[in-house]
Amino acid sequence: MIAEVAAGGALGLALSVLHEAVKRAKDRSVTTRFILHRLEATIDSITPLVVQIDKFSEEMEDSTSRKVNKRLKLLLENAVSLVEENAELRRRNVRKKFRYMRDIKEFEAKLRWVVDVDVQVNQLADIKELKAKMSEISTKLDKIMPQPKFEIHIGWCSGKTNRAIRFTFCSDDS
């Protein structure tokens, strides 16, 4: 799946580079392996979203989608350098290992947050745009095809002879 993402766009390429860096770092570092497993699971879970974001950004040249792409790409590039620096540390350098572990955890949380929030905001914007288009289509259809009118008249008096219910169907065939 990562190979398909890399063929996609700039985000896909950055995501595949990060995925490869995480694989290499897992082989080198024993102390941060569990965090890297979690990061790899996060990458696997957001891969379909990144594919969608890449696909939609190619179709629509929108300034907001470009901003989202740029932020995600920078975040992924920073993560690649962070993971690679973590993998290069020696075992004895415990203080830096813990700092990198904390930074990788923060990155994972930030990545999930950015993807969740940006995707939700973009979905809300798309829904709003879709509602406006549907309203426009509805008004055009109302102009083309007038709706029939139903009238219901109910008359009731206390006397026995004045009870009546009348239904009228009117169509505007002008």
Curated annotation (Swiss-Prot):
Residues 68-145 form a coiled coil. Ecotypes susceptible to Erysiphe cichoracearum, such as cv. Columbia, are lacking RPW8.1 and RPW8.2 but contain in place HR4. The lineage of its organism: Eukaryota, Viridiplantae, Streptophyta, Embryophyta, Tracheophyta. Residues 1-153 form the RPW8 domain. Induction: Expressed in leaves after powdery mildew infection (e.g. Erysiphe cichoracearum UCSC1). Induced in seedlings by the beneficial symbiotic fungus Trichoderma atroviride. It comes from the Eukaryota. Pfam families: RPW8. Disease resistance (R) protein that induces localized, salicylic acid-dependent defenses. Confers resistance to powdery mildew (e.g. Erysiphe cichoracearum UCSC1). The keyword Transferase does not apply. This is Protein RESISTANCE TO POWDERY MILDEW 8.2. The keyword Transmembrane helix applies. It is a single-pass membrane protein. One of its GO terms (cellular component) is membrane. Belongs to the plant RPW8 protein family. GO terms for biological process: defense response to fungus; innate immune response; plant-type hypersensitive response; response to fungus; response to symbiotic fungus. Keywords: Coiled coil, Hypersensitive response, Membrane, Plant defense, Transmembrane, Transmembrane helix. InterPro entries: Powdery_mildew-R_dom. The chain crosses the membrane at residues 7-23.
